[in-house]
A protein has these predicted regions:
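Predominantly a Rossmann-like dinucleotide-binding segment in NAD(P)-dependent oxidoreductases
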Residues: 122-196
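Rossmann-fold dehydrogenase core element
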Residues: 101-119, 139-142
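Contiguous beta-strand/loop segments that form the cofactor/metal-binding neighborhood of enzyme cores
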Residues: 183-228
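Short, Asp-centered acidic motifs that coordinate Mg2+ and/or phosphate
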Residues: 32, 62, 142
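N-terminal Rossmann-like dinucleotide-binding module
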Residues: 1-44
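Short strand-turn motif at the edge of the Rossmann-like AdoMet-binding core
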Residues: 90-91, 117-119, 147
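Beta-loop-alpha module in the N-terminal Rossmann-like domain of NAD(P)-dependent dehydrogenases
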Residues: 45-105
């Protein structure tokens, strides 16, 4: 019996990837799709549209929360309380305080949940972990990583996805949205990085950042992160 998946929020650049995975995996099936903005739901899945999030949750064995960041905590809590495992886009909330509160609610529900941080699943990262464990690189003197995304240039953040450029809804700009992948990747290598300073590159309107850099420490060596 395939696992039924409901999409809570469709105005996200990764929607096509999610639909592709569901369509290609015989053990998965799409159960329902919901978004507060009906224009965000593509015509290809129009037959799966439901009028409210609760109905989508009830139809599913598990849910993917890819709504705007300001909606994610509430949707995650509703799904978790209903006993539906949750895969949620990152960041899981707009602020650290909201994220901690969400984590507490998820823990109380005892429902499995995880953010969509995919770098830690890359085979290359697992190989690097083995290289570091074996000491093949010798003594580390510094670490750096960068993450680039063309979304601001190719129109990925337009239309139903324009919320990603609104700090009030997204919570973070490009640095926070992308560098979180790098922070998680370093954590997956064995030690959580400690960030000490951040510099943001602002857009012309000055509303949010289009990238930036962060300095810190990882495994007692200097760490530099860059994302845009």
């Amino acid at each position: 019996m395939p696992i039924s998946i409901s999409l809570l929020g469709c105005g996200h650049p990764h929607l096509s990837d999610l639909l592709g995975v569901i369509a290609s995996e015989p053990d998965l099936r799409l159960a329902a799709a919901w978004d507060a903005d009906r224009s965000a739901i593509p015509g290809a899945i129009a037959n799966y549209v439901v009028s409210d999030a609760e109905r989508a949750i009830r139809r599913a064995d598990a849910v993917v929360v890819s709504a705007a960041t300001d909606q994610r905590p509430e949707l995650c809590v509703r799904a978790a309380r209903a006993g539906r495992p949750v895969l949620v886009e990152k960041p899981i909330a707009r602020t650290a305080a909201e994220a901690r509160a969400l984590a507490r609610e998820i823990a109380r529900s005892r429902t499995p949940a995880m953010p969509a941080l995919f770098l830690r699943e890359l085979p290359a990262l697992h190989r690097l972990q083995g290289v570091l464990r074996a000491g093949l690189l010798g003594r580390l003197s510094a670490a750096s990583a960068s993450y680039l995304h063309a979304g601001a240039l190719d129109g990925s953040f337009s239309g139903p996805r324009s919320w990603m450029q609104d700090p009030a809804r997204a919570g973070v700009g490009a640095l926070g949205d992308l560098a979180i992948h790098l922070v998680d990747a370093f954590a997956a290598l064995g030690d959580a990085p400690r960030l000490l300073a951040v510099s943001l590159d602002r857009d012309a309107a000055g509303r949010g950042d289009v990238g930036g850099s962060a300095l810190g420490r990882w495994r007692d060596v200097p760490l530099t992160l860059r994302a845009s």
